Amino acid sequence: MNANVTVDDAISNVNLLDTLAIPDDLPDIEARALPLLYRSNFDTNFEDRSAFVTGIAKYSEEATRHAQFNDMLSEGLQHAANMYTWRCCSRAVPMAKSNDQPNRTEINEMVVEVLKPEVSKLGSFMRFTLTAIQRFCEEVRRLCHSEKRRDFVSEAYLLTLGRFINMFAVLDELKNMKASIKNDFSTFRRASQFLTAMSDTQAVHDMQNLSMFLATQNKIKDDLKLQMKTIEGYEELLCDVVNICAHMYEHQLYLSPNEKHMFVKVIAFSLFLMDGDAANVAKLDQKKRLSISRLDKIFKTLEVVPLYGDMQIQPFAFVRRSSHYEPSKWPLSDKESDRCHVNIVEKVQSIRSDHESYVTQFAKINNEVAICDRPGNDSENREITSLALSGIQLLCQWSCAVVETISWKLLNPTNPKDNRECPENAEEYERATRYNYSPAEKTALIQIIAMIKGLQSMLGKTESDMSNSTRKCVYVELQAFIHHTINEPLQKAVKHKKDLLASILQSVKDSISDAGNELNRMTDVKGKKKSSAPKGDSANSSSSDIRIPRRTAAPGSTQLYMARTQLESLISDKLCGGKKILRKELDSKTIEKISVFLRKSAHWPALFRLSDSMTEAGELSQLWFREFYLEMTMGQRIQFPIEMSMPWILTDYILSCNEPSLIESALYQLDLYNDAAQYSLFNFNKQFLYDEVEAEVNLCFDQFVYKLSEMVFTHYKQLASCMLLDKRFKAEILRSGTMIRSPSAARFESLLQQRHVQLLGRSVDLNRVVSQRVNMALLKALDAAIWKFESEPLSSIVELDMLIDTNRLCHTLLSDVLHSIAPFDDLFQEANHAVNSPHGRITLHVFWELNYDFVPNFVYNGSTHRFVRARHVFRKTPAREKPPQVGQVYYWGSKSLMAAFMNICNAYSQCIGTQHLKAITRLLHYQGIAVILDELLKMTNRLLNDKIRRHVRNVFNMMPKVCKLPRSDYGSNALLQYYVHHLEAVGKYPELKSEFCQDLRELGNMIVFCQQLEVALGQEEAHDLFLAAAYTGTVPQPPARNAQEQMKQLAKLEDKYSRIHLTEIIDKISPDDGQAAIAKDAELMTKERLCCGLNAFENFLVRIKQMLAADDIWTGGYPTNGVFWIDECVEWYRVYSALQFFLCQPTRDDNEVYAEELFGDSLQWGGLTLITLLGQHRRFEVLDFCYHLHRVNKADGKDEVISGIRLAKMVERIRRFQLLNNQIFIILENQLNENNDDPNERVREFAPPVHPNYANHAARRQ
C-alpha cells in the first residue's frame, strides 16, 4: 500500500465511488425487465439426428420429418403474422378519377410499384398453403397405410400434426377475415391490367388462381377436408390426435396459454375434418375410440378461445359446421352461455391463495439456499426444479384466466340496453372493451395481472440459479434413470435374448448416458467378479456402486426426443417394429418407472429454456392488439384512442377508483405495453406496430404521471389539512352530526420509490417525473392562495397564512417520498413573484389594502385591540381582481375540508387583530415590513401636509384668537355656554365631523397599525428566539437553593446542550474559517434581535415628529412670552380641544350617530399622537376645554340643558374620552421614553416673572 497518497488523490478516489452502480433497495412492484443479453438455445431442430447411430432407424426418420414440419410451421406462423398485421394500402394510394385523367398511367405505375411486394407475399402464402396441405396429406396417407395403421406414433409427432391442423385453421380464418387483403389485391390487379403488364400466360394464370384463392371463403379448410377424404382410415389418425390433445388438456400438460387453446382448437377442427360423407364421429364414439361426452365437457369448459391476436373463435363452431352434426349428442356445448366460462371475480380468490402459498414456499427455499455458502445437494436441486415448474404452471393458469376472459368479452360486446353506462353511439370495439367490464371484473383482472407479472419478476431474478439447479437435477435424474432403471431390464433382455427390446434399451442408454463406455466396462467387470452371486442381485450391485457426477449439463433436444420416443414405444399398446408389442415383455414396476420418467421429462425442454418459458406463460400482449376490430371499421379508424385500450383502461381504473390496494399494481398494467412491443418486434416483425405501441405508451405514460401526481398531491394535501385542523373543532362538528374524514391510507410510497421503471427499453425515474408534476401542483396551489388573497380584503391574510402552512406541511410530507421536489421556499418565492421583483405579490397587496381599504375604512377598538370596518365609509374601495377558477384540491384538498376551514377563517374575516398582524410579520418578514412602513410614512406625510394642514388652518381662522379658561366660580353651566359661544364658528365648519375626522382617523389607523405590528413582531421574534435557544447556547437558569448549586446545574446543562450548539460544532469540524465567522455573526444577530433596541414603532413616531417640526402651524411659532402659548389659539392641541368639545356633545336626535361609532378610537390616536409628538401633552391636559368643564362640573354637579346640550351627559362623555386619552398618552409616553438613556433632565432657565402692570410701566419709561 502506498503511504504517500495526497489528500487530493484520496478525495478523487472517494469521488470515484459515485460511478459504481449500486443496486437500489427499492420495493419490487414492477414486472420483469427483459435484458438486452444473448440467450442460449439448445433446440437444434433435429439437425444432429444423424449422430445417434445406435438409435432405431424409424425414429431417426421420424425426427427428419419432424424437423421438416417444424420448418413449415415456422413459415406458416410468418404468413399468419403477415396476414394479421396487414393494413389496407389501397385506401392510401391515389386513384384515377376518370379514364381521361392525363396522369392515370403514372398513378397506376405507382400503385403497381407499391403493391407488388405485398401481392408477392400473397402469392407465397397461396403456394405455401397448397404445399402444406399436400405435405400434410402425404404424411397422413403414409401413417394411414394398411401396414402402418397399428404402428406406434410418438406423442411428440402427434402433437406436431395437431399443430399443423391448428395452423390450417388459423390461416383460413385470417384469410376470411381480412377484407383489406382482397381490396389491395383488386386494386393491384386493376392497375396491372391497365398497364398490360402481365402479358405472360403463366402470370395471368397465377393471378387468376390467387384471385380465386382469396375470394373463396374457407378455401384452406375445404381443400384440406377434400383431400383428407381420399385417404382411407384418416379418421383413426385424427382420432389419435384428438385423444392426445384431450389428454394433454385434461391433465394440464401445457405450460403456456397458446398450448392450452391450441389443444381445444385442434380437437374441434379435427372433428370437423373427421366428419366426411358419413357420421364418422358418432361411429368412432360407438367404437369407443372417441368419447363425445368427454369432448363435450372440454368444449363447455372453454367456450371461447383466442384464434390469433384479438381474433376470437368458439371452438365448438367447427363441430356445428359439420354436415352430420347432431345437437342431442352435445347437450352441454350446444347451448351457448350468456356468461363467461371463467368467473374472474371468484377466480381471483383461489389465484390469490395459490400465489401466497407459492411465494411463501419460494421465499423459504430461496432463503435456505441463500444462507448456505455451498453448492446445493440433490434434494435442494430437486425442490428448486419442482418450484420452477410449479411457477410456470401457475403463470400459465393465471394467464389463461385473463386471456379467456378478455376473449369472451371481445366476442360478446355489451349493448346500451343491458348497460346503462354504454352510450348509444359507442363503437363496436368500445362496447367490447371500455363498457364491457364491471368494476369488480376490472379489479380482479388488475390483481391477477399484478400477480402474474410479480411472479414473473420474482422468478426472473433467480433465473440463473434456478436454471443451474434444474440442469443439475435433470442430469442426476437422467443418469440415475439410465443406470438404475434401465440396467436391470436391459440385462434381462440380453439374457433372455430379446434382441429388439435389448437394442431399444441399449439405444436409450447410449443416447443419454454421459460416460457410456466406462460405465459399461465397469458393469461388465463387476458382473464377472460376482458371477457366483444370485442372479437377481447382479444388476443391483453393479448399479449401486456407480457414482454419478453432479454436472450442470442438460440433454440436447434431439437427445431427449430420441430417448423419450423410444421409451414411449416400449410401453405403448401399439406395434413397435417387428410387429411386436414390447410392453408385454416388461414387468409392471419397470413400466411404472418409465411412465413416471416420461411424465417428468415432458416438461424438461421448457425448464431448459426457463426465461422463454416464463415469458410465454405470462405473455399478455393480446390485451393490446386490435387488428381485427380495426379491420371491421373499414378504414374509419386508423387506430383506436387510449380510452378503448385495455392496458390503459385498467391503469386508469387504478388511478380513479380510490382503492389503495390497487395502486401498487399500476406498473404491472403498463408492462402490458412491453409485452405488445416485444410481440410486435420479435413475433410479428412489424416496425409500424411497435411505433403504434410506442405512441400510445408516450401518451398513456404522460397521462399516468399526470393522474398519479394529482392523486399524490390530493392525498397529501388532504392529509396536511386534516393534521392542521383543530381537534376540538372536529370533535364539535362531529357532535353536531358532521364528520370530516381523514384520507384513507394510501400506498404511494412503494410506487413513488421506483427510480428505474422499464418501459419499451427506457429507464424512467418515476420519482423524478412525479416530483416535477407535484412541483407544478404546489406552485399552482401557492399561486391560487395568493390570488385568493389578492381578491379579498386584508382580513383574509389569516386564511393565506393557513393555506401556506398547509402547503408547507404538504411539502414536508411529500418530500419524504419525492426526493426531487424543489425546496418550499423556492416555490413560495416563485409564486409570490419575489424572484425577479424587489417586492412580492403579498407585500404589494398588503400595501394596496392598507392604502385603499384599511386606512380609510377601518376603525380601531382599543378594548379588543382590533380593527373593524366602519359603519359609514368615506372612501370607496376600488374593485379587486377576481381570482382564476381552480379546483378545491388546490386550496384545502376537498369540499368538506374547505367548508371546515372557511368556517374557521370566517371568524377572522370581519376584523383585523393580533392574528392578522402576526400573519403579516410571518409572510412579509423584515424586508416587506420595512417597505410597508416606508409607504405608510409617505402616506402620513401627504396626509399631514395636504389634508390635515388645510383643516387646521381653517379651524384656526374660525376660532377666537384668545380663549381663556373661565373661572370655576361661574359654574359648569356658564362654562358650557361660554365655550358654545366662543366655538360656535368652529362648530359650523362643514368638514369638521366628516373630512377632518376622517383624515385624523386615517392618521390614527396608520399609527395604531404600526404599533400593533411592532407588538406582533416582538412576539414572533421572542418565539423564534425561544426555539433557537438550544442551538445558540442560550440555556435558561435552572431553579436551585443557592447560587453555587445553580452554577453547577447550569454547567451540566451547558455541557449537555453544547452537542447541538451550531457555532461550536462548526468551529470543530469546519476547516473553513470563513464559515465559522459567518456562523458566529448569524448567532449574534439571532441573539441580539431584541437586545439592540430596534423598535419600528418608535422610529415611525420619530419620523412623524420630524415632519411636524418642519412647519410652525402645529406650534404657533415662538411664543410672545418666551415660554409657551397659554390662552392663544395657535397650537395644535387647541384645534384638537375644539374638535373634542364637539365630539363629546351628546346627540340631539335619535338618528344622529356618535363619532366613536364612525371613527372608533383611531381619531383620538391620530390627534393625541400629534399632541404627544409636539410636546403639548401637559398643556392639553391642563388647558383643554372639555377637561376644564369636567373639573368644574365635578365640583358643582350641575345639570342643565344649554343650547340643546344636556350638561350631565356631555360631562359623562368627557370622562370616557379622558380615560381613553390617558391610556393613549401612557402608551405613547412609554414608547417614546423607553430608550431615552439621557440622565440629564432637559432644564431651561427663565427670568423671574414680572407683573403685567410693572411691565407696562417699564415699557412707557423706555
Swiss-Prot record:
The keyword Cytoplasm applies. Pfam families: CYRIA-B_Rac1-bd, FragX_IP. GO terms for biological process: axon guidance; cell migration; cell morphogenesis; cell projection assembly; embryonic body morphogenesis; positive regulation of clathrin-dependent endocytosis; positive regulation of egg-laying behavior; regulation of actin filament polymerization. One of its GO terms (cellular component) is synapse. Keywords: Cytoplasm, Developmental protein. It comes from the Eukaryota. It is found in: Cytoplasm. GO terms for molecular function: RNA 7-methylguanosine cap binding; small GTPase binding. Its main location: cytoplasm. Disruption phenotype: Embryonic lethal with cells differentiating, but failing to become organized. The external hypodermal cells fail to spread over and enclose the embryo, but instead cluster on the dorsal side. In one study, animals are viable and there is defective extension of body wall muscle connections or arms towards the ventral nerve cord. In this same study, double knockout with madd-3 results in severe muscle arm extension defects. Required for initial steps of body morphogenesis. May play a role in egg laying and yolk protein clatherin-mediated endocytosis by oocytes during oogenesis. Plays a role in the formation of muscle connections, also called muscle arm extensions, between the body wall and the motor axons in the dorsal and ventral cord. PANTHER family: CYTOPLASMIC FMR1-INTERACTING PROTEIN-RELATED. Belongs to the CYFIP family. Interacts with gex-3. This is Cytoplasmic FMR1-interacting protein homolog. It comes from Caenorhabditis elegans. The lineage of its organism: Eukaryota, Metazoa, Ecdysozoa, Nematoda, Chromadorea.
